Amino acid sequence: MKTTHFLIVGVVASMMAYGVKGEDGTLRDDTLTVVASQFTAGDHMSVCDPAGNRITFVVKERSKVPQTQQHVRQDNALAKVGPSLDEPYYQVRMALPIPSAYTPTEQGALVGLDEGVYHHMHSAALEALPNGDMLAIYFSTPVGLAEKDTATTFVQCRRRAGNDYWDMPELLFDTKGGNDQSALLFRDGQRIWFFGGGRGMTDMVPFRVCYSDDNGVSWTYNVPRLDKPASDYTAQPVSNAFRDPEGNLYIVMDAAGSQSFLWRSSDNGLSWHDMGGRTDARHSSIVPLDDKGTLLSIGGKNNDCEGWNPQNISHDWGATWEKATPGVIPPLGTAQRPNMIRLQSGNLLLVTDSYQHKKKIAPPAGWKMGNECVCGVSKDNGKTWTFKALPGTLPQHHRVAHPSVGYVTVRQSDNGMIHILTTTNYPGLEIEFNEAWFWSAEGDLTADTFAPYNLGEGWTVDTASHTAVWTQYWSNGQKHMESTWNIWPTPRDGHRPLCGRIAEGPARHYDEQGHLVREYMFHDGVLQDSIEGETGIKDEGL
């Protein structure tokens, strides 16, 4: 029995129960179509479970190439250009526009955003590319649908080297009839790996494996070869990947319940093996402490050890883990995870929330950082830590008592700058700073001035009013859509203007003959009313 699954956006499609026989007892032979631009099918696109049920992934080319994948530098001349590493530097930017970030209804398409870009953008991946750009990948879910729904997509954003503005979010890929959830990016020399999760497809595909050798312009797509069906897992890659001295590649994934574990590939991303051990928290952040297999796992959520976030040590690359001990940060809950990386200096860096927002649980006694979002640095492989509050953070969009970095991801670029990507805020942020700022007495942003506005193709900027108009065209050259944006806005829950985009004013839609079809009015990123182009009649109830 062979079926091909497609999805109409806005309609919940039933997830196929892969790995079981059809109703008539025959083996399944199913196809999932992956809609993307400049993706090439790799050598491994089909899997069979032990019973013989097959699922095949097919790449289908989009009718357009996202701007994120166009005009990308392929030299590394700008990769090490940046602020001085000797002087404290700390800046905050909006990483996402409003819309689509957490508007009450799906309003992104009304201002010109790409298909598949929805209001919920979460569990993000971040990486500093060889050319100096920053690349972020989120999974995106429409209003009112669950994260495990088949309507989810993977969405990409790029901030180009030397620019203070992120490109507008665009579709990376959409698995029609399958779930796209939880992203991980890993820079491996000149190659960028992307590992994308997705629930409910088959135990033979707990994640997808993509790689790019041209800074994210094009990608090769594969599904993993597992040595046995995945078990005791949740199909969600977390935020860390690394290689060992023998070249084995490891990625972190959620286990079932409040645990995490490592997958290992010994053939450069083709075949994968569950290392077997489990940490004591979901969304754990794991880094090597040496080249002999000693790993440190910190966090991430839904568990505690004596009132603190659990911490585990492995001495065999994650095959086993020592019993959890109380960690150095407070326990976390829903919509929270920490992230830890090793810096170029050799120090460890850790970023986390302090307050458990959904359950309204304050940090444990002994925590000295209040309810702030914090970063911590360890000079001795995690034995001791120094913490500092992160200024300019925002609360979660629906829980506004205290600031949050959400599902945070941290990377360091070749120029030595540290980049933090936050989620669940209104909107998500990028925080950029250096170690000089961390060790200084500075406790705030170091400047409120930015490079000249450079918003990309189709944007006309009025620098005096800090506004811009984004214009898109039909293939015949006629104007298709134009929307107006505040490009130096103060977010709803913030206290200062940031580089970013919030819709402010009209968004006009035209037909292919150039006639105005409809005008939508936005204020602070939210739709206020709509006027029909020909009649001038306003819609009610917006």
Protein language model features and the residues they cover:
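Sec-dependent signal peptide recognition
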Residues: 2-9
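Bacterial Sec-dependent signal peptides at the C-terminal "C-region" and cleavage site
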Residues: 12-26
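Hydrophobic beta-strand positions
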Residues: 20, 27, 47, 242, ...
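Sec-dependent signal peptide cleavage junction
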Residues: 22-25, 31, 71-73, 452-455, ...
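Vicinal oxygen chelate
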Residues: 29-63
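Glycine/tyrosine- and acidic-biased, solvent-exposed loop/turn segments at the edges of beta-strands
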Residues: 41, 162, 448-542
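Asp-box/BNR beta-propeller blade signature and adjacent active/binding-site loops
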Residues: 48, 55-455, 465-466
